[in-house]
Each structure stands twice: as structure tokens, then as C-alpha cells.
């Protein structure tokens, strides 16, 4: 089996080669820059290379999301944030193929608007009780909140019982025709709704935090209703009136979870349509390896992972135990991430354990679309073994001079 070992020195040679070519082009680029300065504009282009596999090309210069920062602020834990964004992009690829569309971060739903959507619906008495500044800050006059109304209730415990916040975040992704490198006319949009699975509250300011688990059926029901309302609102924008819009509902894990959540439903609304007629259930599950939960879904994979751990402990004294996170789609393992901790004593040992794990990955993980195995000494990366569904063999990267 062919092995691919990628070393940093290779990257250095590549960069050096590119550098010579860049020097030859520098005068030409300088003239281009001067011309752009004179015209008062920056040339808009699209990236022309996929970094890895089936990825979108992006419009340059890159425009940051109008809601930048909310992904980190509003998710229950960091695992949810990354999984929500990456998973939404994967779902987008099924609707807006990477060969036909360019990608741009969301430009239509800004931070203030999304925050207003995350508020509860206000009653008239609640709006009347606000001063002008508070009304303006919360956009209370527009009353855009999508979460259930508290109906004037102020007791945190009763709110948790009767009208908890289901919607935690909204993420927008925009798509343009492959030839529209200036991003003149949007051709499609994906909107993700991140839902809470647990509602957290305090009975008094700076007091103990309490939690209430939310019902799965109600989470999905609320998400679908909210998506319908968002659709009617974004259709009011002339640019978004006649484009397909894909919606996906994501159920987060709780604050203390070390695994991310999963998408539970999705739908695509065709051009010009203002109502959502049907949804498709998404059957995703994320589990730790090894674990009872993973064993219930794929006992063979769970047992194989245990066997790898046992073998590593037998052959390498400085190995403790690997921990993996696997994402199942319709009970089939699709993505796997593994952290392998070692105590570093020398490069030969790192190479040996990397070679062995690569062999085991080919043996046990070959049916998984994507996997990434990170070999670490504490926080220091020592090696990376990865494979995408486009790779015939695993890609292996041993880090040099990283003692």
C-alpha cells in the first residue's frame, strides 16, 4: 500500500519555488495595485484552487460575516460551534454544488438582527415598560423575537418551565454563480438554526445555575416554525425574493458535553416560494469512542477501537489511551476524529507509533468517509494521519523540530 509521508522540509522547498515565481511577478502586481488605488477599488476575484477535496471557492477580497462573533458567543460549547458551521457547509453542498457556486459568508442577517431574532416575543405591556434606549437596543418596536413569549412572567423558574429559549443562534451562508467573481447577484442561501437541548437559568443574579432538558419533539417543532417565520422575513428583501433557500435545524449538546450536537431536519425552499411545505428528517448522532452509545450504533467499530487501544498499550510504553469522536449518519460512521496522547522521548518512537496507527486505520477505518488522527505530546502536535473520501490512501504528516 502506498504511503504518503509529508514533511515540513517539503513545504519549505515548495514555498521557495513559489517565492522565485512571485518575485518575477512582483512588478506586475505592483502596477496592478497602483491602478486599483487610482480607481479607488479593489479587484474582486475568486480563489481558483480547492484546498482539499470538494470545497467551495470563495469570492475575494473575503467579506466577513455581518454576524461575525455570534458563533462563538451564542453556542452552548465550542464543539457545537465548529460542528454547526462545518456541518451546515456540508449540507449546503448537497443543494449548491461546489462546481456551480462560489461561497461567501452571510451578508444579509447582521448581528443586531440575529440578536433580535433570538429574543423572546414581547407582549405589549413588556414593550411599554421599556425606556426608549432599551426598545431601540432590543428592536422591541419591531418585536422580531422568535423564542416563546414570557407573557409578562419574570420568575426564572416559571419561564424555564413554560417558555424557555429554544433558538440559540442563526448562521447564514451565501452562494453565487461560479462565474460571478464580483458577487453581484446572490443565487442561493443556507440558513442554519442552532437549537438548545438544555435551557440554563439563574433564580437570582450571580446565583447558582440551573438547567432544564428540553423535549426533542418540541425542539424540532419550534425550529420548523421559526424557519417558516425567517423565510417570510428574508423574502421581503428584493435580492432574496427569487432564490432557493435551504434551512437546517441543529440540536446542540449541553454546556459540559465534550461531543458536538447533530442536525435533525432540513428543507430547501424553491425560488420565490414563501412557505415551507415539507421537511426531511436528518438522522445524525455523535458519540465518543469507545463508549456504550457508540457500541449500540456500531458495535464492531467500538470493539475495533478498543482493540487498537489495547495493542498500542502493549507495543508502546509511553501510550495511555486514544479517545475518538465519531459522527454517524443513518447509523453509518461518516466522520471520525481521534486524539492519541504520547509522552515524547524521540523521533524514532513517534515515527514507529505513527506507522502502526496508520496501518490500523487502514485496517479498521477504511469504510469511514473521513478521519483525522492527531498524535500529541500534551498540546504539541507530533503527527497527523488523515483521509478524506477522495483519498485512496491516508495522508501522513510527521511534524519536525517540534520538541
Per-range role (PLM):
Residues 290-403:
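Hydrophilic extracytoplasmic domains
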Residues 26-58:
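Post-signal peptide N-terminal segment of mature Sec-exported envelope proteins
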Residues 13-17:
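C-terminal motif of bacterial Sec signal peptides marking the signal peptidase cleavage site
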Residues 212-239, 348-370:
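Short, non-transmembrane amphipathic alpha-helical segments
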Residues 257-312:
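Surface-exposed beta-loop interaction hotspot
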Residues 1-4:
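Positively charged n-region of N-terminal signal peptides that target proteins for export
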Residues 159, 163-199, 316-342:
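Short edge beta-strands and adjacent turn/loop segments
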Residues 18-22:
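Bacterial signal peptide processing site
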Amino acid at each position: 500500500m502506498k504511503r504518503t509521508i509529508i514533511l515540513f522540509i517539503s513545504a519549505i522547498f515548495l514555498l521557495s519555488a513559489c517565492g522565485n515565481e512571485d518575485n518575477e511577478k512582483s512588478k506586475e502586481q505592483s502596477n496592478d495595485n497602483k491602478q486599483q488605488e487610482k480607481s479607488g477599488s479593489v479587484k474582486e476575484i475568486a480563489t481558483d484552487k480547492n484546498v482539499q477535496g470538494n470545497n467551495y471557492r470563495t469570492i475575494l477580497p473575503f467579506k466577513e460575516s455581518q454576524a461575525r462573533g455570534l458563533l462563538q458567543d451564542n453556542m452552548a460549547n465550542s464543539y457545537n460551534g465548529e460542528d454547526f458551521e462545518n456541518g451546515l457547509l456540508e449540507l449546503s453542498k448537497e443543494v449548491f454544488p461546489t462546481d456551480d457556486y462560489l461561497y461567501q459568508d452571510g451578508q444579509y442577517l447582521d448581528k443586531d438582527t440575529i440578536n433580535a431574532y433570538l429574543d423572546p416575543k414581547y407582549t405589549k405591556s413588556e414593550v411599554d415598560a421599556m425606556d426608549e434606549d432599551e426598545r431601540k437596543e432590543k428592536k422591541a418596536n419591531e418585536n422580531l423575537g422568535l423564542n416563546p413569549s414570557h407573557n409578562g412572567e419574570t420568575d426564572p423558574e416559571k419561564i424555564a418551565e413554560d417558555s424557555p429559549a429554544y433558538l440559540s443562534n442563526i448562521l447564514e451562508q451565501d452562494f453565487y454563480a461560479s462565474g460571478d467573481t464580483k458577487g453581484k447577484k446572490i443565487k442561493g442561501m443556507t440558513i442554519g438554526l442552532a437549537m438548545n437541548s438544555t435551557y440554563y437559568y439563574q433564580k437570582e443574579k450571580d446565583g447558582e445555575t440551573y438547567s432544564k432538558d428540553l423535549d426533542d419533539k418540541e425542539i424540532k417543532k419550534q425550529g420548523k416554525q421559526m424557519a417558516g417565520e425567517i423565510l417570510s422575513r428574508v423574502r421581503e428583501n428584493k435580492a432574496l425574493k427569487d432564490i432557493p433557500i435551504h434551512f437546517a435545524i441543529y440540536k446542540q449538546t449541553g454546556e459540559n458535553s465534550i461531543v458536538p450536537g447533530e442536525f435533525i431536519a432540513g428543507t430547501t425552499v424553491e425560488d420565490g416560494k414563501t412557505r415551507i411545505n415539507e421537511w426531511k428528517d436528518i438522522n445524525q448522532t455523535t458519540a465518543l469512542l469507545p463508549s456504550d452509545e457508540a457500541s449500540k450504533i456500531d458495535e464492531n467499530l467500538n470493539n475495533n477501537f478498543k482493540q487498537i487501544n489495547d495493542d498500542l498499550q502493549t507495543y508502546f510504553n509511553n501510550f495511555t489511551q486514544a479517545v475518538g469522536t465519531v459522527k454517524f449518519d443513518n447509523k453509518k460512521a461518516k466522520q471520525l476524529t481521534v486524539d492519541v496522547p504520547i509522552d515524547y522521548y524521540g523521533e524514532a518512537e513517534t515515527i514507529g507509533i505513527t506507522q502502526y496507527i496508520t496501518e490500523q486505520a487502514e485496517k479498521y477505518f477504511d469504510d469511514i468517509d473521513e478521519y483525522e488522527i492527531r498524535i500529541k505530546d500534551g498540546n504539541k502536535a507530533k503527527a497527523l494521519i488523515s483521509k478524506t473520501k477522495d483519498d485512496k490512501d491516508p495522508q501522513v504528516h510527521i511534524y519536525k523540530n517540534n520538541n
